[in-house]
C-alpha cells in the first residue's frame, strides 16, 4: 500500500509530517510512504528512510493563496504533486495538512470526482462523551447543497462508518432545528423524505445540542450548517477549557486541586480532541484524500495515516461506488 503525503503542509511541517510518517512505517509493515516537499528539510527530520521515498519540490501552496488559482498555476506544489501521485497510480491515497480549499481543488481537478457524485463532502470524525465519536458531513466543501447531495453524503458516511470505524448498521441522523418529522427548511424536509427510503439506518432528525452525546454515528448536513456547527463545538470546547484553567489557577487551594485532577483532566482533553480520530476525508472522489488538521503534530499525522490506510484496506471507495450504482445514482 502506498500513501503520498504533502510534507510541506501544516503549521509544523515538515517535522511533524516526517515523524508521523516514521511512526506509521514502524506500525504497518505493508505501508510505503512518499513524502512530497523540500528534500533537504525532510532529511533533517528523517532518521530512517525505510519504505519512505522523497519526491523533491521547492514549491508549496500558502494558506493565503486563492485555492483554485493556486492549484491550477502551481503544478509543482507539494500538495498538487501528492494528488498527482494518486492520479498516476503511484499512490493509493494522499494526505495534506495544508490549505483546505486548495486540497479540495486538488482533489477535484487532479484526483477526480467519483462518477455519479455531484459534490464531494468534507467529513471529520467528531468526539463524543463516550469516546466513540461520530462522522459529520459536510462541514464546508459544499455550502449550497441540493437534496441529492445530502442523500449521497448519508450513503457515503454510512459506508465509511461501517467499513473504517467498525460500526455495524451505523445510525444516520439529519442535522436539524428539531427532532420532529417535518421540522426545518425546505431542503431539510426534502432530504428527510429521501433518507427514509435510503438503504441506511436513518434515525431521523438530530439537534446540534445532542451531537456530543452520540445521538448518531453519522450526521448529515449542508456545508454551511456543518461548518457553523463544527466551529461552534470547537469554540465552546476551547472556551470551557480556558475558563476551567483560569479557575483552577486562581488560588493556592485550587492549584492543589488542579494537581490532583490533572490526570483526569488530561483524559478528558484527549477524549474531546478530534484530531486523534484522524483527518477529515473528502468523500466523493476517485481515491481517498484526507485533510489533516492544520496544527497537526506527529501523533495527529499518524492518526491520519492510520485512517487513510483503513480506507484503502477496507475498499471504502469501491464500496461507495457499488452502493451508488445499485441505487441508480450513477
Swiss-Prot record:
Q: Which cysteines does the record link by disulfide bonds? A: none
Subunit info here reads: Homodimer. Probably interacts with PlsY.
What protein name does the entry list?
A: Phosphate acyltransferase
Localization annotation: Cytoplasm
Q: What class of enzyme is it?
A: transferase
| Major place of residence | cytoplasm
Q: Which gene encodes it?
A: plsX
Q: Name one GO biological process term.
A: phospholipid biosynthetic process
Q: Which NCBIfam families match?
A: plsX
| Protein's job | Catalyzes the reversible formation of acyl-phosphate (acyl-PO(4)) from acyl-[acyl-carrier-protein] (acyl-ACP). This enzyme utilizes acyl-ACP as fatty acyl donor, but not acyl-CoA.
Q: Which UniProt keywords apply?
A: Cytoplasm, Lipid biosynthesis, Lipid metabolism, Phospholipid biosynthesis, Phospholipid metabolism, Transferase
Q: Which family does it belong to?
A: Belongs to the PlsX family.
Q: Recorded GO terms, molecular function?
A: phosphate:acyl-[acyl carrier protein] acyltransferase activity
Q: Which chemical reaction does it catalyze?
A: a fatty acyl-[ACP] + phosphate = an acyl phosphate + holo-[ACP]
